[in-house]
Amino acid sequence: KKEGFEIELPAVGHRTGFAATYKSNKPGPTVVFLAEYDALAGLGHGCGHNVFGATSSLAGAALKSVVDQIGGEVRVYGTPGEEGGQNGSAKGSFVKKGYLNDVDFALCVHPGSGPEDGLSTRNYACAPVDIEFWGKPAHAAGCPQDGINALDAQILTYAAVGVLRQQLTDRIRIHGVIVDGGTAPNVIPEY
């Protein structure tokens, strides 16, 4: 706020999420710095999340200091729950709510291994996929032959993706979670 940004707080359904915007009077690109923060449950700031927010906020303020001369718009989006918080990732919420639709560049910083005296870059695109499996419910003890187990299909697919990872390069990440695995052990799950 001290730097002249307009602040939206909270933003995109996240209590600690924010959107800071500074528009120059000249046309130009829209640049967003993604300020990730909030510790991971049980781990804390395990991979530098305490650094992300400050670094991106500083970068946004630095670009803002020259944007009136060069033109464009600078935004800083505060994105808590980067690896899945109570409301999911705020980055995902910014995407879903259209905050990145008119953005030319979106940048963030992530400390990690790389050259000791320099910078390295990575580009991780995110392509969320929801897979649903449908079967036929049946009592597991009384008439299992009448059921088609949707959970078995989920588990086989999950395991196959796990095996696929050994053929992928180090820079490709695939993560998954089974959000519904049935209702009771003695019922063959339909979904």
For each predicted feature, which ranges?
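Short coil/turn segments at beta-strand junctions that form active-site/ligand-binding loops
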Residues: 28-29, 72
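Short beta-strand element of the alpha/beta-hydrolase
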Residues: 30-34
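Histidine-anchored nucleotide/phosphate-binding helix
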Residues: 56-64
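Solvent-exposed, charged/polar functional surfaces in cytosolic regulatory/catalytic domains
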Residues: 2, 62, 160
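A non-catalytic alpha/beta surface segment that caps or lines the substrate-entry region
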Residues: 1-26
